[in-house]
């Protein structure tokens, strides 16, 4: 038979675990992590779309990406799937789930057991400028903790990549 103080400690521990699980689930639903970046390039909408849609060329500006494999090869579309080889050795796979030419495309991938949604949005500001918005959202158990960790790490790569992408896209307008 267990001593009363042992039973009390076990019950308190179990209650603590239940409260922690409820807190994580509540955070997951109420405050899911979202990473969003908006920037403007000096290209018409169509040219900005075409430039970014060449995902196999992303390593030229996204230095954390070594290689992008697109299936089927060629143009990005609703049936496209892909895999990236990252400089840290990871090989995340993704599939396009939404494709609205010159407006947005969204692909879905994974990180551990989380599902990550990457939205690439385009908005014409005027005939020579386009606003591009990247939105990264995560869903899954523990997203309030793991999603924030993913966002913290990924945001640094994203900020460096966007700066290089803007330079590359703006330089392409004179060619």
Regions inferred by a protein language model and the residue ranges of each:
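Alpha/beta-hydrolase-fold catalytic nucleophile elbow
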Residues: 135
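Glycine-rich portal/gate segments that line the openings of hydrophobic small-molecule binding cavities
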Residues: 4-13, 40, 59-60, 69-117, ...
